[in-house]
């Protein structure tokens, strides 16, 4: 049965086109995906991401548990509220999910995981947590709104109670704090996102989400759907689980080496496989592609490099760059001239570093000589 967020009627009243996304009835756009993309890059937009899963982890051994569970190291989290992006791996080094974890106390961490992986994630977390005596509590009582764009933070801060505004203004990137709206709604506010823009992701009680959404819109934030969220995250060089990596792909094969912490004395799940991969040299690599010809790069298209064949993982037309962009997984090593098979024609593409766009600006080299 398709699940709905509490904002479902609100989305429909706003004229949203709804689609099934991982078993959830979600808005793909509210009229124009392109306009919503540009609004987030230039002003602000709000996404309903309440389909994602919030999990609270508690216990005296929660930190040792997470040191074992995650490829990135929670030892990096020294200050309450700080967040960490990490992959959770299986014993073969494949990615069970990518997630964000927040350090809220020595015996309390909060995790946000993907919607499509909810059941397997919860089963895996509970299995791995049991020997550590850590409780795994899903929080279906919390909704999530992502308010993103250059104006997003100022608007949200303007809706907070006076006593919290200074702390919210000073809140650093990849950090969170507990605050209240000026009408008393409890808000867990994180300076994180999935768009390449500044902004907040806000966890709040389900029974308050419609009212707070309406206040955001009244303050000038425009609704944005999953279509714009996808083009924004792709421009920002951010992976989508299930499309860019899965349980058969290691972080090293998904351009996520920066999320792997091979710190001494920490035996995390999958570490031995990653160390062997690193020593041998990865068999595959994930690269960024830009197509200067008119057209769109799409998932599944064949990619040819000097090292052999690969394929496009995520591909789209970039509204910011007005070019086709993509992630591709190809054989490791020298790439040479790279081409993509588009309807039987080998079309040349350029290899560029991620991200394609950061805070509204094309990154060096992405636009080429033009």
Swiss-Prot record:
The lineage of its organism: Bacteria, Pseudomonadati, Pseudomonadota, Gammaproteobacteria, Lysobacterales. Pfam families: GCV_T (PF01571), GCV_T_C (PF08669). It comes from Stenotrophomonas maltophilia (strain R551-3). This is Aminomethyltransferase. GO terms for biological process: glycine decarboxylation via glycine cleavage system. The glycine cleavage system catalyzes the degradation of glycine. It comes from the Bacteria. Coiled coil: none annotated. InterPro entries: GCS_T (IPR006223), GCS_T_bac (IPR022903), GCST_C (IPR013977), GCV_T_N (IPR006222), GcvT/YgfZ/DmdA (IPR028896), GcvT/YgfZ_C (IPR029043), TrmE/GcvT_dom1 (IPR027266). Its EC number is 2.1.2.10. NCBIfam families: gcvT, PRK00389.1. Belongs to the GcvT family. Keywords: Aminotransferase, Transferase. The glycine cleavage system is composed of four proteins: P, T, L and H. It catalyses: N(6)-[(R)-S(8)-aminomethyldihydrolipoyl]-L-lysyl-[protein] + (6S)-5,6,7,8-tetrahydrofolate = N(6)-[(R)-dihydrolipoyl]-L-lysyl-[protein] + (6R)-5,10-methylene-5,6,7,8-tetrahydrofolate + NH4(+). One of its GO terms (cellular component) is cytosol. GO terms for molecular function: aminomethyltransferase activity; transaminase activity.
